[in-house]
Amino acid sequence: MLKRRLPALLLALLLLAAMAFPAAAETKPAAEDALQDTARYLHDLVAEPTVSGLGGDWTVLGLARSGLPVERAYYDGYLARAAAYIAEKEGILHQRKYTEYSRVVLVLTALGQNPRSVGGYDVLSPLFSFDAVSRQGLTGPAFALLALDSGGYDAPEGLRQQYVDHLLAQELEGGGFALSGVVADPDVTAMVLQSLAPYGAQETVAQAAERAFARLSALQKDNGGFASYGVECSESAAQVLLALDAWGLPFDDPRFVKNGHTAAEALLSFWRQGQGFVHTAQPDQSIAIVSCEQGLLALAALHRRQEGRGSLYTMTDACARFPELSGHPARQAVEELTALGVISGMGDGTFRPDAPLDRASFCTMAVKLLGLTPRWTDRFDDVAQSSWYGGYL
């Protein structure tokens, strides 16, 4: 019976999704122009991308998540060079900086590739070492969570919660986060918020996020921008936009509009047509590739929101290609709902379309379809707050 009814159920969900996810308010033409212009600039500048924290992985990630047309040969070239690099390094990308693994996992996931088999090596499993990852401070666990959750990858039981708890323990008095000191930094606070978004159903996470967003709002300048270490820069505005994106908040959330100016407007003030983004607005500033890459990621998030697609780091639309659905009547509905971030696979590369649908999964899909915010209650004795479905019931 389930086999006969699954396509109809998924079709009904897809129709509901069309109603529940209206297109976001039209992004200003300048944002679309900046997206296409910056994508073109980086594509030409980084002609042969490879594994690199600058002018490599982030460029490929931004292009892949933008949804703009890019020739497949560009991505295939990156994958070939990445595989060769990883093989040359014998799978050891760095002894201490485990963000190297997270970054590569994010790019591979965006390209629909399996990070557990690249050049004969597994670049996902190093993120399973809590001690090694957490030695890097806040950025290690934050990006490990982004990488693990980007494709819904299986991980050792309790590992994700360890990372979440580690991040929460670093919260500053009054809210927010910083790599050092007692003053919240907008970039770091925004990055941590991005990584915690999937865990917003946990009360402690939700409360920390509320304080962090309040701190970011207080840090916002009158022109809509943000300053990191006393310098107003494009990267700070970009990261705050990505935090709003991750939590599904409006980019013009009233808390982030100062004197009529938004973070998106502030970001665009750093854009130079035909050249990408500058780091600061000083007249003598030259184009900085890191500014271009982070600007591209934020603009891609804006673009995806406008098209009603999932957030930048929710990559089930890219990674979920299920071979067993070939010829299955539910294939198209599954792929479209996956692209919307409503459903995902089993975490092992399969979808199992004829498996029973449990109540936890159904409630999760319904909440996502209706655009509701997950919220934990203790109504059910057999549901743990830390469970992936706890906030959806």
Indicate residue ranges for each PLM-predicted region:
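Bacterial N-terminal signal peptides that target proteins for export
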Residues: 1-10
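Terminal, non-catalytic domain-edge segments
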Residues: 26-37, 266, 280-320
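Bacterial N-terminal signal peptides
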Residues: 10-18
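Feature responds to low-complexity, polar/acidic, surface-exposed segments characteristic
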Residues: 129-131, 173, 177, 203-206, ...
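Low-complexity, Ser/Thr/Pro/Gly-enriched N-terminal "stalk/linker" regions
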Residues: 26-93, 103-107, 111-126, 147, ...
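An alpha-helical repeat/solenoid feature that recognizes helix-turn-helix modules
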Residues: 47-71, 92-116, 133-160, 172-210, ...
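Sec/Tat signal peptide C-region and signal peptidase I cleavage site
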Residues: 21-25
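Glycine-rich, acidic and aromatic/proline-enriched surface loops and short helix-turn segments
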Residues: 169, 197-198, 218, 245-246, ...
